[in-house]
Design a protein with these regions (language model features):
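Acidic, mature catalytic/reactive cores of soluble proteins
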Residues: 1-161
Length: 161
């Protein structure tokens, strides 16, 4: 597994999401949209199947490219057009919404675990605070729910909302 991840999934600064039916990489820096995805990078760190320096580099890329003041987005930039070999599944949701660049609480939990495994507790805590409901008591309109509720997701930075 480690050899396959290193030879097929490492894109230079992070791990790709996958390879389409036509052989195109999803989550590659060479793309205009969907350059980086959260899940393959946090799970590379959590699974400990990749070299630690690569896991650290991947998580540094997550922080640079996906981290926001409201949590970590699932992908960036969000998709606006069909990806050959994948179809329209990436376009089910609008830009910055849910799986198309939104911020999911459960995926943010994985980010915290990954940083903890890498020994970066301060960064893990920073991620936790970024989507902690009580943090938004003075700006409840951001989540539009009671201040004790963890929403499924928050609109991502590319959302028009």
């Amino acid at each position: 597994m480690s050899a396959a991840l290193e030879s097929e999934a490492w894109d230079g600064d992070w791990y790709i999401r996958g390879i389409s039916a036509t052989g195109a990489k999803l989550g590659s820096d060479s793309l205009d949209e969907g350059k980086i995805y959260l899940e393959p990078n946090v799970w590379a760190a959590i699974s400990q199947t990749v070299p630690e320096e690569r896991a650290i580099g991947a998580m540094d890329s997550v922080q640079r490219r996906l981290s926001t003041e409201h949590g970590v987005a699932l992908c960036a930039p969000a998709h606006t057009k069909e990806v050959p070999g994948v179809g329209l599944s990436l376009l089910v949701f609008p830009v910055g919404h849910k799986e198309n660049g939104g911020i999911f609480c459960h995926a943010n939990s994985w980010t915290i675990v990954a940083e903890g495994i890498l020994g970066r507790g301060d960064r893990a805590y920073q991620y936790y605070r970024s989507y902690l409901p009580a943090r938004y008591n003075d700006s409840a309109e951001v989540h539009q729910v009671e201040p004790y509720v963890y929403c499924q997701f928050t609109h991502g930075p590319e959302s028009p909302r």
